[in-house]
């Protein structure tokens, strides 16, 4: 009995170590949070320091020079604007030393300012994006890290790297508060 328990414990520890080593293929872990209030203007997510928080954890022992690619999309996939990896953004690389580091959407503006890969649109046009308003729906913002020089994937694919689900609604028409009905102006 004692021998079989020791064998079972050894097998469990070995299985755990093997699964951990397979789970750590990508050296970066991205966590994305979108905070309320949720705006229909996509620019608000990168102009407001309190709207989007991105935590990048570098699990390796070396600093990484990266760029981010990703998408903002409805859960049903009917609306999607996506920048795929394979072409670094026009700005300098984002340097991520070992450990966990938090960024806001505004922190990333200088890095992405020069643009990057081609934006692919589904269910929305470039003109609608330029006008700044996203259609109503339930959205997620998903990000993935790539090596700035080699374009090697450094973080896991969706759904990892995706934000919480957030709902965008268009404001209703204004309500007239004054004057009261029958009151003279």
Where are these regions (language model features)?
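A glycine-anchored, Pro-Gly-centered beta-turn/N-cap motif
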Residues: 135-142
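Proline-enriched interdomain boundary motifs that mark the N-terminal boundary
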Residues: 29-30, 171-179
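Contiguous beta-strand segments within globular domains
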Residues: 34-76, 181-185
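Beta-strand-rich extracellular modules
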Residues: 144-148
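Short beta-strand elements
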Residues: 149-174
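Bacterial N-terminal signal peptides
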Residues: 9-20
């Amino acid at each position: 009995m004692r021998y079989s328990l020791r064998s079972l414990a050894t097998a469990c520890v070995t299985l755990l170590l093997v699964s951990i080593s397979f789970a750590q293929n990508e050296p970066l872990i991205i966590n994305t949070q979108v905070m309320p209030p949720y705006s229909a203007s996509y620019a608000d997510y990168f102009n407001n320091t309190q709207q989007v928080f991105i935590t990048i954890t570098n699990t390796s022992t070396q600093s990484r020079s990266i760029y981010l690619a990703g998408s903002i999309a409805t859960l049903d996939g009917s609306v999607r604007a996506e920048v795929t990896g394979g072409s670094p953004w026009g700005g300098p690389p984002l340097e991520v030393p070992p450990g966990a580091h938090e960024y806001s959407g505004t922190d990333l503006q200088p890095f992405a300012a020069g643009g990057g890969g081609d934006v692919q649109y589904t269910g929305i046009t470039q003109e609608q994006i330029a006008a700044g308003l996203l259609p109503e729906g339930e959205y997620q913002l998903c990000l993935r890290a790539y090596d700035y020089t080699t374009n090697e994937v450094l973080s896991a694919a969706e759904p990892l790297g995706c934000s919480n689900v957030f709902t965008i609604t268009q404001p209703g028409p204004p309500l007239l508060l004054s004057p009261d009905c029958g009151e003279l102006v």
